[in-house]
């Protein structure tokens, strides 16, 4: 009775589909009409049909849930099968209708990320644009929602998080009393030190950089800090919110007198969320993420920088036209985005070249040695150069991706790996048309991602719901679906045998890592001195590096800045291992061709073998006229094994990071020792401590331990998969067994819900066919429309 009351106490929330009252129904219809206004009419129709399918399914599940709860409300105990069904129903009812699609804008300061987002949402100057004296200071997430107003939430570091950073900042800024003049000059010119000093001056006033940690703790910050550590801003118009938001998300690169109270707290800002009203340009469910710089000195913000990159399913590496061909920071960000494909959720990478309208025609013609040939206008030259850049950078990007990812990775099949955009021309149209600015092309890509994701999620949702409604039939009878098979133990034995085969297949799949991992360790052992030297020795000597190195040591081998190149000694030392394992690792966790020897393919093979056996059992049990019994079992298998994918995605990040994390953990004592060094020749002494520490750890098995820790993570994943599959399949077979006398007469009559769910399930195909027909008609009309003139002959 107690567990029943606990279940009854949970009121299912039917997301956006509360269709039980007429006024609510009208509001929801209006909501849907506005929700899809970012899409062309053909896509709007498809999305509305999928939305209706999902809403009606959620309503059927809610009705079924309420009936089942009421039917057993007075029972002293709930049979395990019914408890399983009720919990599954509740989980499906409360499941989010659409997981956000995060699109990451990754680029250095001044690359044009904010300008690009402003153009995509068609709000000029909404986010602050980097200039000579200002830049975006934190991660900014922009999405559209159901709110009527423009809204922003500024999330601040907690008190403990700021105290931890404050302690490191003061350590970094502390100058030893006996430093010689040479060290003092170097200290004054250090970029890391200047950035740390700027943070303290901004928050506590001029002279704060000379105060000690305990003194600063007693000072009150100049800006107002709410107890909730969250600041909410609202406005009726975009421009109004932009003015309010501006001081929080943009910071001056140099000290500036007269900063506002809002600007004064930017060192405390963790990240900012901006929510637009329903947008006719960016669909609901899309989050555009401006990811500035290469990380942050604050550990919490730096972890968030990495995690934000990893949760993006799409990453656009932003580079302006004048920096697209080089620059260490740009190459580092490109490498970071490729790593996100390995360890994170990223499925698409593209290079977005910005500011393509910037071209001096006479210089361009002279460089191309074209004289007075075909190119006659600025527009033609810009379009030709765009095509050249696309060909060159696409080739470069593909080569990089092929070195790191399997040859059949989906990202390599993308039709557009490079975009050439101009936010300026999107607004002005003095040289290029709106289409030629390629802003609409980026919007179209986003829309297609959302439409495809919605289709897949709704199909999976309706199919899973149909399986649950079939389960009520199973629980409502004293007969077993698989009585003979279960009684003879045939099916259980079959599952156990297949489980053993799955376990061996997973072991063989992971064993492919053994050789490249071993080779990587050997290469790392022969190259670590050279790698460490390249990190510690600078062409200018120690000028401008003294306190930067101290910052590296304070953060256990990592220095990240909003404006400077990222330094990570641990990643550098582990890179030879990753160079060897990346293609194989990507192959194991790939989502490419179904014939590929990937981990999920072994799980799919296990699923298909069970489904085939269920079909055989169905034939022997006389299910030809009642395919629903077989459908229930097959769909339960799909639901059980389908849930493994998210588990594997979460675990693979930990596996991939394990090598670098292991090296960082083992080198932590030498970093801590080096961070304490002050006085004369401190920079060289810190380097010596780091070198000796690395030498000692390598001799004691630094890389071998990293190898073993990665293997440990692989073993944990294998164990987790097999245990989850065993437990879930056992539960499913138990549900297929007889439920016992008495249960059938206690359950509510949900036959109407079953019939409605059957109709919804059958309509999935019709909706998909309608969507395909609309797409074909739309493509036909586009092909028949007059084509735009392209650039004249492209020359490489």
From Swiss-Prot:
GO terms for cellular component: nuclear speck; nucleus. Its EC number is 3.6.1.-. GTP binds at residues 107-114. It is an enzyme of class 3 (hydrolase). It is found in: Nucleus speckle. The keyword Ion transport does not apply. The keyword Transcription does not apply. Transmembrane segments: none annotated. Keywords: Coiled coil, GTP-binding, Hydrolase, Nucleotide-binding, Nucleus. Residues 158-185, 742-776 form a coiled coil. Its main location: nucleus. Signal peptide: none annotated. GO terms for molecular function: GTP binding; hydrolase activity. GO terms for biological process: DNA damage response; somatic hypermutation of immunoglobulin genes. Disruption phenotype: B-cell and T-cell development is unaffected, and germinal centers form normally. Class-switch recombination in B-cells is not affected. B-cells in older mice (3 months onwards) show significantly increased somatic hypermutation near the immunoglobulin heavy chain locus, mainly at G:C base pairs. Other loci also show increased rates of somatic hypermutation. Nuclear GTPase found in germinal center B-cells, where it may inhibit function of the activation-induced cytidine deaminase AICDA. Reduces somatic hypermutation in B-cells which may enhance genome stability. This is Nuclear GTPase SLIP-GC.
């Amino acid at each position: 009775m107690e567990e029943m009351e606990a279940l009854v106490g949970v009121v299912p929330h039917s997301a956006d589909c509360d269709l039980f009252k007429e006024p609510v129904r009208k509001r929801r219809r209006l909501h849907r009409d506005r929700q899809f206004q970012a899409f062309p009419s053909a896509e709007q129709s498809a999305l509305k049909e999928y939305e209706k399918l999902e809403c009606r399914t959620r309503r059927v599940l809610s009705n079924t849930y309420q009936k089942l709860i009421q039917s057993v409300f007075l029972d002293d105990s709930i049979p395990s099968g019914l408890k399983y069904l009720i919990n599954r129903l509740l989980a499906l009812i409360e499941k989010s209708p659409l997981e956000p699609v995060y699109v990451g804008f990754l680029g250095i300061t001044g690359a044009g990320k904010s300008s690009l987002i402003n153009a995509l949402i068609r709000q000029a100057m909404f986010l602050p644009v980097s200039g000579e004296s200002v830049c975006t200071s934190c991660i900014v997430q922009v999405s559209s929602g159901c709110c009527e107003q423009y809204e922003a939430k500024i999330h601040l570091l907690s008190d403990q998080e700021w105290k931890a950073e404050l302690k490191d900042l003061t350590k970094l800024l502390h100058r030893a009393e006996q430093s010689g003049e040479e060290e003092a000059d170097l200290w004054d010119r250090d970029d890391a030190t200047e950035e740390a000093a700027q943070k303290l001056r901004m928050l506590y006033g001029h002279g704060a950089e000379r105060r000690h940690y305990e003194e600063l703790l007693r000072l009150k910050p100049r800006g107002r800090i709410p107890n909730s550590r969250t600041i909410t801003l609202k406005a009726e118009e975009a421009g109004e919110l932009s003015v309010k938001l501006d001081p929080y998300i943009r910071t001056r690169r140099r000290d500036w007198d007269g900063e506002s109270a809002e600007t004064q707290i930017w060192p405390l800002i963790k990240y900012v969320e901006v929510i637009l009203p329903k947008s006719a340009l960016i669909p609901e469910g899309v989050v555009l993420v401006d990811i500035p710089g290469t990380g942050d000195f604050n550990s919490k913000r730096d972890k968030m920088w990495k995690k934000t990159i990893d949760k993006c399913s799409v990453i656009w590496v932003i580079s302006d036209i004048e920096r697209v061909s080089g620059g260490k920071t740009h190459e580092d960000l490109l490498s970071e985005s490729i790593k996100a494909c390995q360890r994170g959720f990223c499925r698409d990478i593209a290079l977005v070249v910005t500011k393509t309208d910037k071209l001096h025609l006479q210089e361009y013609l002279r460089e191309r040695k074209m004289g007075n040939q075909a190119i006659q206008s600025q527009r033609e030259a810009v379009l030709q150069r765009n095509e050249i850049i696309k060909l060159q950078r696409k080739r470069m990007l593909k080569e990089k991706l092929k070195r790191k990812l399997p040859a059949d990775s989906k990202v390599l099949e993308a039709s557009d790996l490079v975009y050439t955009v101009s936010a300026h021309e999107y607004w002005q149209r003095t040289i290029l048309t709106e289409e030629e600015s390629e802003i609409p092309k980026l919007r179209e890509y986003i829309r297609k991602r959302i439409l495809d994701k919605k289709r897949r999620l709704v199909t999976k949702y309706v199919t899973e719901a149909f399986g649950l409604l079939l389960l009520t039939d199973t629980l409502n009878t004293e007969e077993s679906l698989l009585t003979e098979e279960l009684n003879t133990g045939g099916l259980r034995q079959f599952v156990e045998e297949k489980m053993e085969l799955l376990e061996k297949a997973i072991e063989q799949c992971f064993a492919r890592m053994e050789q490249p991992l071993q080779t990587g360790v050997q290469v790392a052992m022969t190259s670590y001195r050279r790698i460490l030297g390249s990190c510690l020795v600078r062409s200018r000597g120690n000028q401008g590096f003294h306190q930067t190195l101290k910052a590296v040591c304070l953060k256990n081998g990592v220095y990240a800045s909003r404006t400077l190149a990222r330094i990570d000694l641990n990643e550098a030392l582990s890179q030879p291992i990753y160079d060897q394992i990346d293609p194989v690792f990507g192959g194991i966790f790939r989502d490419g061709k179904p014939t590929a020897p990937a981990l999920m393919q072994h799980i799919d093979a296990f699923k298909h073998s069970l489904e085939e056996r269920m079909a055989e059992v169905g034939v022997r049990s006389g299910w030809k006229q009642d395919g629903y019994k077989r459908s229930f079992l097959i769909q339960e298998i799909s639901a059980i094994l389908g849930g493994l994918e998210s588990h594997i995605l979460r675990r693979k990040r930990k596996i991939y990071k394990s090598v670098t994390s292991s090296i960082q953990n083992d080198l932590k004592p030498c970093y801590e020792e080096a961070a304490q060094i002050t006085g004369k020749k401190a920079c060289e002494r810190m380097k010596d401590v780091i070198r000796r520490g690395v030498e000692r750890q390598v001799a004691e098995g630094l890389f071998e331990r990293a190898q073993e820790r990665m293997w440990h993570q692989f073993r944990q994943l294998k164990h987790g998969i097999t245990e989850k599959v065993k437990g879930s399949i056992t539960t499913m077979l138990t549900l297929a067994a007889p439920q016992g006398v008495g249960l059938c007469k206690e359950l509510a009559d949900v036959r109407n819900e079953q019939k409605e769910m059957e109709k919804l399930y059958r309509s999935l195909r019709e909706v998909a066919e309608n969507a395909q027909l609309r797409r074909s008609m739309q493509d036909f009309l586009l092909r028949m429309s007059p084509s735009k003139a392209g650039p004249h002959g492209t020359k490489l």
